[in-house]
A protein has these predicted regions:
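Walker A/P-loop
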Residues: 19-20
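Hydrophobic anchor at the beta1->P-loop junction of P-loop NTPases
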Residues: 10-11, 117
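ATP-dependent NMP and nucleoside kinases share a basic, alpha-helical "lid"
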Residues: 33, 102-146
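Walker A (P-loop) phosphate-binding loop of P-loop NTPases
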Residues: 15-16
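ATP-dependent small-molecule kinase phosphotransfer cores
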Residues: 39-113
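Post-Walker A helix-loop "phosphate-sensing" segment adjacent to the P-loop in P-loop NTPases
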Residues: 27-35, 53
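Conserved small/polar residues in nucleotide/adenosyl-binding loops
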Residues: 147-153
């Protein structure tokens, strides 16, 4: 039996452009697995918030719809601020700029299959997907201004 393999990275010059929607369609209609670069970071953030006494239900809220809401137990920091500083200021700046790439690329190289990465935000992430034999799809939503670009977040 021949196993087909494909790696697709999604990026957009503007937030809320439909990357998750496209990833959902690829997952639902074509059997892709969604493997985000931020998966390990999200687990770290959830563990940190749990240690502060934030309930799993509230963590789920803060990690999705409530990303910009102050979290009292975290001295008023938002989920987004916590995740961005852990991911960029600590992970990328202190440990290694490629810290979040290995789990995704290793998963793809070991398990293969159809994989979509919907959270490509930096140039090294973009290049890692291409270097692994994948392709990059630019998602553009009419009416959204180009507030950020790959490598600028």
């Amino acid at each position: 039996m021949v196993s087909y393999q494909q790696l697709i990275g999604l990026y957009s010059p503007a937030p809320q452009s439909g990357k998750s929607t496209v990833a959902g369609i690829l997952e639902r209609d074509y059997g892709f697995r969604r493997v985000p670069f931020a998966a390990a970071l999200k687990k770290m953030t959830e563990t940190f918030l749990t240690s502060l006494g934030v309930s799993p239900e509230r963590i789920a809220h803060y990690s999705e719809a409530g990303k910009l809401e102050p979290i009292p137990e975290a001295k008023g920091a938002t989920y987004r601020k916590i995740a961005q500083t852990m991911g960029t200021d600590w992970g990328r700046a202190v440990i290694d700029r490629d810290i979040w790439l290995a789990p995704v690329i290793n998963d793809y190289e070991i398990n293969g299959g159809l994989v979509v990465v919907e959270d490509v935000r930096f140039e090294n992430e973009y290049n890692a997907i291409l270097d692994a034999g994948g392709e990059m799809w630019k998602i553009v939503r009419p009416g959204r201004s180009e507030e950020r670009r790959v490598g600028k977040e």
